[in-house]
């Protein structure tokens, strides 16, 4: 972010960075309001798929005339001008193909650990992974997704709980930060 900020400022632009706690809707809305009050002309946002945030994006574009670009996670049903990021469904499909190649099993059990439900990028990865695994390994059981809020300690507790319950677990698919907690 610092590098991109510097590049924009080299061209005479001004960049204001407002960090919020991951998944915190209230902080996101407050930051958006403060940025509007600061007179911004455009907003780059990693959105949360929450009705209030989606409405605020539309308000920014329609009422305030502030262009909004979403990054990393998309919210298609808004007035944002574009999305910059990966095809998360395809990323999930690719992960399923790699998982299948690594496991080389016709059946097994796979746990899924993700960040938060309201991050569309993460939920799209899960969808792509599960959909592809059903096609290429229909006998593989995919457990219900558990959420670690991208926290290593929570991820570690979830992993321990999963391993205690499923002694024959084949793999864990993790879509977010928290990998240290899963692997340690």
What feature does the model see in each segment?
Residues 2, 81-82, 109-118:
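Short beta-strand segments enriched in small/hydrophobic residues
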Residues 20, 48, 72-75, 115:
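Short, ordered loop/turn segments at secondary-structure junctions
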Residues 29, 89, 93, 122-130:
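Short, surface-exposed alpha-helical segments at coil->helix boundaries
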Residues 41-61, 129, 143-184:
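Hydrophobic alpha-helical
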Residues 51-90:
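Flexible loop/hinge segments that line or gate small-molecule binding clefts
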Residues 83-109, 155-156:
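Hydrophobic alpha-helical segments within soluble ligand-binding/sensing domains
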């Amino acid at each position: 972010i610092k590098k991109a900020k510097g590049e924009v400022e080299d061209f005479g632009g001004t960049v204001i960075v407002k960090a919020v706690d991951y998944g915190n809707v209230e902080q996101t809305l407050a930051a958006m309001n403060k940025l509007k009050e600061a007179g911004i002309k455009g907003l780059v946002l990693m959105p949360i798929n929450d009705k209030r945030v989606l409405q605020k994006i539309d308000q920014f574009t329609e009422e305030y005339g502030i262009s909004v670009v979403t990054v990393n996670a998309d919210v298609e049903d808004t007035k944002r001008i574009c999305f910059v990021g990966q095809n998360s469904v395809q990323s999930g499909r690719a992960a399923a193909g790699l998982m299948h190649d690594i496991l080389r099993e016709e059946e097994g059990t796979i746990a899924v650990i993700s960040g938060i439900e309201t991050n569309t990028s993460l939920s799209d990865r899960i969808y792509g992974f599960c959909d592809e695994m059903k096609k290429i390994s229909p006998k593989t059981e995919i457990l219900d997704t558990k959420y670690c809020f991208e926290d290593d300690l929570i991820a570690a507790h979830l992993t321990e709980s999963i391993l205690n319950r499923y002694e024959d677990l084949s793999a864990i698919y993790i879509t977010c930060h928290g990998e240290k907690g899963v692997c340690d």
